Amino acid sequence: MDFLMSKHEADAPHLLIVEARFYDDLADALLDGAKAALDEAGATYDVVTVPGALEIPATISFALDGADNGGTEYDGFVALGTVIRGETYHFDIVSNESCRALTDLSVEESIAIGNGILTVENEEQAWVRARREDKDKGGFAARAALTMIGLRKKFGA
């Protein structure tokens, strides 16, 4: 399995898409929307895959640490994944903690993150949100990250 795919051109915003592949087909749809939005905007990106939504914030933190040590610097991040409610409390933990950790990272590190982690009751709701022809939440998250990159630059952060 390739854990890093790259599309990179000079002088364009460069983002890291971190996708949780717990539900492969839904992950494909979210990623398709995010990549299309970034391509349309002329942005470049790398894609890394993680097992689930809880691993997304840590991966972004790894990327930030790597940049501090001479690795790739990213202008922003796109978090993609799907959490579907089951019969246990696990849904609430994953939904709340992944969102909280992304918010903490964005505020504490002053970074642009587009949150495209779907938190839904069932697979039908997930598909409506993931498909580009419906709500296109992958594309929405990518556009949100680009907007936040612009605001960060505007304020000189």
UniProtKB/Swiss-Prot annotation:
Give any Pfam family that matches: DMRL_synthase
Do you know what upregulates this one?
Answer: The two ribH genes may be differentially expressed during the Brucella infection cycle. Brucella would use RibH1 for flavin biosynthesis during the extracellular phase and RibH2 during intracellular growth.
Q: Which UniProt keywords apply?
A: Riboflavin biosynthesis, Transferase
| Gene Ontology cellular component list | cytosol; riboflavin synthase complex
Q: Does the keyword Transferase apply?
A: yes
Pathway it acts in? Cofactor biosynthesis; riboflavin biosynthesis; riboflavin from 2-hydroxy-3-oxobutyl phosphate and 5-amino-6-(D-ribitylamino)uracil: step 1/2
Q: Where is the active site?
A: H90
What Gene Ontology biological process does one annotation of this record name? riboflavin biosynthetic process
Q: Which GO terms describe its molecular function?
A: 6,7-dimethyl-8-ribityllumazine synthase activity
Indicate the enzyme's highest-level EC class.
Answer: transferase
Please write the reaction equations for the catalytic activity of this protein.
(2S)-2-hydroxy-3-oxobutyl phosphate + 5-amino-6-(D-ribitylamino)uracil = 6,7-dimethyl-8-(1-D-ribityl)lumazine + phosphate + 2 H2O + H(+)
E.C. designation(s): 2.5.1.78
Binding-site residues for (2S)-2-hydroxy-3-oxobutyl phosphate, renumbered to this chain: E87, T88, R129
Enumerate the residues binding 5-amino-6-(D-ribitylamino)uracil.
Answer: F22, A53, L54, E55, T82, V83, I84, N115
Relate the protein's function as given in its record.
Catalyzes the formation of 6,7-dimethyl-8-ribityllumazine by condensation of 5-amino-6-(D-ribitylamino)uracil with 3,4-dihydroxy-2-butanone 4-phosphate. This is the penultimate step in the biosynthesis of riboflavin.
Report the sequence similarity comment from the record: Belongs to the DMRL synthase family.
Name of protein: 6,7-dimethyl-8-ribityllumazine synthase 1
Organism for this UniProt entry: Brucella suis biovar 1 (strain 1330)
